[in-house]
């Protein structure tokens, strides 16, 4: 089944003794059903044009398509030159046609009516292209409709015979248009929006759906490589080239970039869970750099070297004892033989350096530790408004970058913006 949905303008049903766009589509596509849309002003007319209600639309259409079913819709449009005025109305009518005739092919007349109507139908096609076709009809002289002789209702029967005679000797002026450039422009903007939100998988799916996309193969390759790197926590090739032979810096910088990406796109719970682990790794590098041999490794696990400094060992034991006052449990050197983590590193630096930039930033990470444990281990939901949790998480993410720069001062500021630079490179290919 074929259905034609057609707005009607002042150049319908004919002009200069030749078909208007709607009638020409009916003539050459022979639809089973035609839905005509009139604004009330077009239907009623004004001092310049007699209203379209004066024409016998059923008789005109059935003169060239005898068994065609015709439905007329007339609506009051308050602001006819508003591009949004027809969006919901046209969509509603087309949804109704699809629901009543699910297997029908719907032709959209994008030549008749106002520019606002034509654009709305083009957008409808771009958004919901399934089983729809946009039909454009050129003028007989392939020029505009300026200075044309409009149809007159009072002599429509005679004029219709003349029009049918003229058109019987002429080829079709209909053209199916895919509006690929229009559709691609919308898709490109959607992809750019996804890139701005770091939603690379959705961007890749959208690019893959556009077979004729300019630079599509290259864009898909770059997105796929980045997605795999993020999923597998592989260091970006850019970072490897930028900092060769410094694997620890590469890893710390990669995870800091990913942490900031997750925070910026709103993955707050994921950010909260990861921030302490990344901070722990960075602080471990700081201690190795500034206090060599304080940490020893057993099967790649970090332990406190109690032989590093008797003063530090005694101070650390005293600190542990002060925290165990309620249990009266005394710590011994043997009890310090356990895997180290962020809390222990924080204690060491507070004992060794008192207050400095590193310990201050560590405190910001430590401030969200209880919240992190509730989310990560108790599977609690996250309330950003309670106890200023949102601000505390932001402060912790910022602290990780500051800590990284304290350990690896050679890192450049623009390295943190690698993903934004990647996004821009994809946008340029688009």
From Swiss-Prot:
Non-specific ssRNase activity is allosterically activated by cyclic hexaadenylate (cA6) binding to its CARF domain. cA6 is a second messenger produced by Cas10 of the ternary Csm effector complex in the presence of a cognate target RNA. One of its GO terms (biological process) is defense response to virus. GO terms for molecular function: endonuclease activity. Residues 156-430 are annotated as: HEPN domain. Changing residue 116 to A: Loss of ssRNase activity in the presence or absence of activator. Does not protect against phage infection in a heterologous host. Residues 1-155 are annotated as: CARF domain. Its EC number is 3.1.-.-. It comes from the Bacteria. CRISPR (clustered regularly interspaced short palindromic repeat) is an adaptive immune system that provides protection against mobile genetic elements (viruses, transposable elements and conjugative plasmids). CRISPR clusters contain spacers, sequences complementary to antecedent mobile elements, and target invading nucleic acids. CRISPR clusters are transcribed and processed into CRISPR RNA (crRNA). Homodimer; the composite ssRNase active site is formed at the dimer interface. Encoded in a type III-A CRISPR locus. Belongs to the CRISPR-associated Csm6 family. This is CRISPR system endoribonuclease Csm6.
